Structures are given as C-alpha cells and as structure tokens.
Amino acid sequence: MDWGTELWDQFEVLERHTQWGLDLLDRYVKFVKERTEVEQAYAKQLRSLVKKYLPKRPAKDDPESKFSQQQSFVQILQEVNDFAGQRELVAENLSVRVCLELTKYSQEMKQERKMHFQEGRRAQQQLENGFKQLENSKRKFERDCREAEKAAQTAERLDQDINATKADVEKAKQQAHLRSHMAEESKNEYAAQLQRFNRDQAHFYFSQMPQIFDKLQDMDERRATRLGAGYGLLSEAELEVVPIIAKCLEGMKVAANAVDPKNDSQVLIELHKSGFARPGDVEFEDFSQPMNRAPSDSSLGTPSDGRPELRGPGRSRTKRWPFGKKNKPRPPPLSPLGGPVPSALPNGPPSPRSGRDPLAILSEISKSVKPRLASFRSLRGSRGTVVTEDFSHLPPEQQRKRLQQQLEERSRELQKEVDQREALKKMKDVYEKTPQMGDPASLEPQITETLSNIERLKLEVQKYEAWLAEAESRVLSNRGDSLSRHARPPDPPTSAPPDSSSNSASQDTKESSEEPPSEESQDTPIYTEFDEDFEEEPTSPIGHCVAIYHFEGSSEGTISMAEGEDLSLMEEDKGDGWTRVRRKEGGEGYVPTSYLRVTLN
C-alpha cells in the first residue's frame, strides 16, 4: 500500500503530515541540544565540586594525606572527576552524532520536500490550465451552435416571407451556412480539447501525482527511520560510558573499603609522637615554716659550701600541662645584673654578691642570661620555628624519624651514584678496547663528578648516622626516665621535716652538680660565651612575596604594607590566615595571607 494509490486525492493531508514529521525531527534535535547543555552543566558543576574539596597542598607536604580516610576521600573525588569526564563525553557524542547530523539531515529533507511539492503544484497548475481551455472551447462551441441555429431560423423565416426579396433570402441562407460551419469547427475544437484534457487528467491522477506521492512517502519513511536511529543514539551514548562509569563506582567502593581506622591511629602516632618522657611528680613545697630559714638565705640560696645556688630555668618556671593551651613563655624575673630578684623582706640580709670576685659575678651573669635568652628565643620560636639541618627543632621521636628518612634518601642517592660510577667504568673499558665506539677521555668529567658526589654523599651519610644515633639514644633515655619515674612511688605531701627547704636546696645542688658539664661550658671562656648569648640568631627568608592589596597593620604584631610592595617571606601560614614578612627597609610583622602573592625559594 502506497500513498499514490490510497491517498491520491489527499494532497493537503500529505503536505501537513510531512511538515509535522520535519517539525518533530527539529523538536528532537532541540531536545537533545538542551539535554547536552544539561550534561555539560552537570559535568562542570561536578568538576567545580571536586576542585573545591581537593586538598590545596601537595600530598608530600600534607600530613593529613597519610591517613587512609583522607586517601579514600581523595580517591572518591578523583572518581567523581572521572565520572564528570564521562558526562562530558556523553554530551559531546550527543552534540556531534545527534544534533549536528540530524540538523543537517533535516535541512536536506526540507529541500527534498519542497522540490516534491513544487512538482505536484506545477502538475496541478497544468491540469487546471487544460481544464480552463476545455471550458473556453466548450463555451465557444455552445455559443456558435446557438448562433447557427438562430441564423438557420432567420433564413427559413425569410424564405417563407412573400414580401422578402430574393437577395435577402440568399443573404440569410449564406449567413446560416456560415454559422453552421463555425459551429462545426467549434465542435471539432471542443472535442479535441476534451480529449487532450482527459488524457492529461488521467496522466495526472494515475501517473504523475502517484509518483510524487510515492516520493513523499519514501522521503517521510527515510526521515522516520533516521529519527528512530537518533532515538537509539540517545541510549547508545549512555551505554558507551556505562563500563567506565561502573569502574568509577567500583573505585569509589574500593576507596570506601580502604578506610583502615587502626592504621590511621598508627599513622597519627607516627606523625605526632614526640618521644619526650612523661612529666614527673610535682614535689611538695613546704611554706608552713618560713622562719626556719637561715639568715643568709636569699634568692641566690647559699648552700653549706658557700657557693650561691642557681636554679635553672626549668626549675623556676610554672609546670607545663601538656593538654592545656600553649601560652607564650615569659622570661623569668631578673635583677639589673641579670640574677634573680633579691629577697622581698625589708630587713633581709644583704646580697651575697657584695665582696665577691668580679669574675665570679660575671660567671653568674652569664649563667643567668642564658635562661633569659632561651626564654626570648622560645617566645620567638612560638611564632616561627627556625628549621635546622639536624631537625633539632622537632621533638625527639619526630627528629629520629626525619633523620631516618634523610639517611635513607642519602643512602639511595649514594647507591645510585655508585652504580653510575660502575657503569661509567665499564663504558670506559669498552671505549678503550674499541676506540671507534667513543673517546674514553670524554667520560673523565662525568667520572670525576660522580666521585665527588660519592664523597659528598658519604660525608652526609656519616653525618646523618651520627645525628640519628644521638637522637635514638635521646629517645631511649627519655623512655628510661619515664619508666623509672613511674616505677618510683610518689612522695607523700604531708608532714615535711623542718629543714625541708635546706634539704631541697641541697638536693637541687646535688642534682645540678651531678649533671655533666657541656663541651661549650668547658672549652669556651666566660666572656666569649657571654657575648655569643647576646648575638641575634640570623633568620634567612624562605621566599619572597608581593602585596596584592594595601594593609594598614594597626593591630599588635602586624605590619603595614603598600599595594605592589616586595617583601621577604620569613614564615609560612600555619593555618590561621597570617604570614610573617619582612620589609626591605626593616621591620617584621604579620599580614593576611590572602593579601599576598607568595613565591617560595
């Protein structure tokens, strides 16, 4: 069944139907285009979301990246990013294979439809013109027949009229004959026109228009087939990415199963274990018998041997609670000469410094200045720690681990250089045996450089081994002190003996005398040691930065800067949003990190 046979008289219906089919094709293309925009926006939002939650710092600089929870989260973000890439691929396939191709095909269909309907309308116009000619010849034949009949009646009436002349009768007969001849010609022309029209009409309805309708039917069926294929492309584009999306989902599942709480707990220990010994028991201080002190007892506390008692900074400071807030350390109160504050008693004895040897006084000043400078340095270290090569700024356990890492890295580099030296030696032997392969002298600079690197790395390995051994011994001693301290039962805080103050003083003196003197105190003269303590520790910039915005720096600890000003970076942001910088004309302070463009050395 075809349109040319069954719908031979439904030209307008076919015109509307084919137009509806093309409109449907355009609507589907528009739908897919909007679907593509949705996919692209979805993928863009997913990528923005992933970028928002990805860690800003590199994994090697981020301690949190060592936890399995963080690693799984980063892996999930990467899988989501891959998923977004698949959504972009779906959008691209739909845009190219559906939107572009169907739009081009729709334009071709519209041109073909226009051509077929123009051909049909042209055939209709030709048939209408033939019908008009048939009507004209028919009306002419009808008019000529009436006039011929009228002329024949006139000639017959004159022929019967006795008053009519012979000339009038002859004229009427000639007129009747002429009209009869004209009617006969009109009849023949009408018959020929009718025959021609019937032939054209039969050709129009049985051949010409059915062919046009069949072409329209074929065009519409091809359009429907292509549209159905376009419907299938919508699902095929999804099915093509299903395996990769399934891998993304499987990766998310693997990341979820990779969370290891026990390992994270161990990682936290590895990252933050200090290696310090636990604090010992707080000693009981008896203030109930202040009058039993010796008259010569002062802030320096002269023991029985006549030497002034000097308490170290660790004994005079408030006990540090490890779980409390980290307050800034304050320097111990000092007298104008650098010693402890004299006794507050108005009638107290004079200071034992009077009549002392000046060298002894200078020695006491040097020893008392050390805690003060140490407290100032610890105060500055609370704002920005100076990193040392032996990692002595870290707690013992962390120092040991960092030294172990550095030692392993240097050992690997040393082994690499040794292997390279062996390879160069073999290559040199080959060149010496077969000179056409190369000049042995050309390898001498590389061999020399390799030997220099080996010597340098050996020295570094020895240096780190010594530091590591010292750090390990320190960790072991801290562990031993902690165990022995906890094994000793605490002293009862009740019923102290009357001479507890003198006992504690003598005990402190005994403990201080049992401590081995350092190499610095043995070899360095007192005046040199005193001068070195007052020297400012140099701090070199770790980078430079440029001020993006103007900052007033009105609050305490901050510094003002102008927009575009070049500054030296002294300390990175510790997570509080502030960075310590130094101006070229002098002066250091903190400025907002978001106001800077930072470049590390």
From Swiss-Prot:
Biased composition annotated in UniProt, kind: Acidic residues: 529-538
SUPFAM superfamilies tied to this protein: BAR/IMD domain-like (SSF103657), SH3-domain (SSF50044)
InterPro entries in UniProt: AH/BAR_dom_sf (IPR027267), F_BAR (IPR031160), FCH_dom (IPR001060), HR1_rho-bd (IPR011072), SH3-like_dom_sf (IPR036028), SH3_domain (IPR001452)
Region (Interaction with DNM1 and WASL): 529-601
Biased composition, class Low complexity, residue ranges: 336-346, 497-506
Region described as Required for interaction with FASLG and localization to lysosomes: 471-601
Protein name: Cdc42-interacting protein 4
Organism: Pongo abelii (Sumatran orangutan)
Gene: TRIP10
